[in-house]
């Protein structure tokens, strides 16, 4: 498991980041949010569709997006495009999760991907690596 006390390289303080999780399966979404809150110093907000995600970014500026590919109303690629077209969010790293992912589309957009079922340690390592790069 990642070190719960991820420290800022400058002054040793803990850098708390915000993560927007977009997952329509409530069991998986709650699992991801709980894993983030229990195993990292970061905060996660769960929404269940693309429209809720677009509304959420009017109130928060996440440091990481975690998107399911198969969402109601729009797929994860369409949501990624809308989120990253928003001023100030163009360079926010993104993890796309699904049992079936369109690899070519992910590569064109430099989206990180994980297949379902998720391996928790792999998920937490990727979250830590992406957020650590933004410290």
Question: For the regions a protein language model found, what residue spans apply to each?
Answer:
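Alpha4 helix (beta4-alpha4-beta5 surface) of REC/receiver domains from two-component response regulators
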Residues: 78, 99-116, 121-125
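Two-component/phosphorelay signaling modules centered on CheY-like receiver
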Residues: 25-45
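Acidic, metal-coordinating helix/loop segments flanking the phosphotransfer/catalytic sites
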Residues: 46-64
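Acidic catalytic/metal-coordinating carboxylates
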Residues: 49, 75-81
């Amino acid at each position: 498991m990642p070190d719960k006390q991820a420290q800022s390289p400058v002054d040793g303080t803990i850098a708390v980041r915000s993560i927007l999780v977009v997952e329509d399966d409530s069991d998986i979404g709650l699992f991801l949010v709980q894993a983030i809150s229990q195993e990292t110093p970061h905060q996660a907000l769960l929404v269940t569709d693309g429209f809720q995600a677009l509304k959420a970014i009017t109130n928060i500026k996440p440091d990481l997006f975690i998107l399911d590919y198969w969402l109601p109303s729009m797929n994860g690629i369409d949501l990624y495009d809308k989120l990253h077209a928003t001023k100030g969010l163009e360079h926010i790293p993104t993890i796309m999760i699904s049992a079936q992912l369109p690899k070519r589309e992910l590569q064109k957009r430099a989206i990180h991907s994980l297949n379902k079922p998720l391996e928790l340690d792999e998920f937490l390592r990727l979250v830590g690596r992406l957020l650590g790069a933004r410290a």
